[in-house]
Amino acid sequence: MCIRDSAKPDGYTLMIGASAPQAINPHVYPNLNYDARKDFAPIGLITWLPYLFVVSPDNPAANLKDFLAAAKAKPNQLTYATTGIGTTSHLVTAVLLSKAGAAMVHVPYKGSSQAQTDIVGGRTTATFDTMVSSLAMVKSGRLKALAVSTPERVAMLPDVATVAEQGFPGFDMGAWLGLIAPAGIPPAIQDRLAREMNTVLADPTVRERLGDLGAQVRTTPTPAAFGAMMKNEYESWGAIVRDFNVKATD
């Protein structure tokens, strides 16, 4: 992530920024080798990554309401797997459980694959993970999706209701990816890159391909708009980290 010392801000060095390194990790890890607010210049938003709440196909819950009712009836007897402490998966689940008044035991993993495998194997109960990571398992029948985290249902899984539809109006959480550059890039180059990127993202073929992978194309009209979004995300995720007293373990 530390490109600020070696890369010239001339538009030839670009990178993908994401909600975790740009908005969450600065609040979880005290000794990062970059400053998410000062070291990078925004270009534009690329995609939003919906999260799917998934369980084993053997789980009797038909939807999120059923699942949360069971969790509330058995406090701290069900488990939720995540991709690690302080990850988006962890925080999104924590927010949902708090809103529902349900208590479950957190089981952090080092990634999606093992977390999903243990749900299939019955070692954990549920996980909230990106659609990109879990879509294939859902479509193959190895996992059952009970809810999607975005305000609207997703085209790839039209029968899966949103969290908002199931008792939590306004619920809209997920991860995002965007294009960023080293701080100091000339505004004219910054604006040109944003325009060119948005032209590509308007292509129906590109949008369809990203949709097939489980990502939603969301764009920002200008670098300034993306910068404002990143600032809001930084502050919002920081508040969540503080509310749940999330701290790095390594």
Predicted regions and their residues:
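Short, small-residue-biased leader/transition segments that mark boundaries at the very start
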Residues: 1-3
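Hinge/capping helix and adjacent helix->loop/strand transition within the periplasmic-binding protein
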Residues: 5-13, 19, 27-114, 163-165, ...
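Paired acidic/hydrophobic, glycine-rich loop segments that form the ligand-binding mouth/hinge
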Residues: 11-17, 125-129, 144-147, 237-238
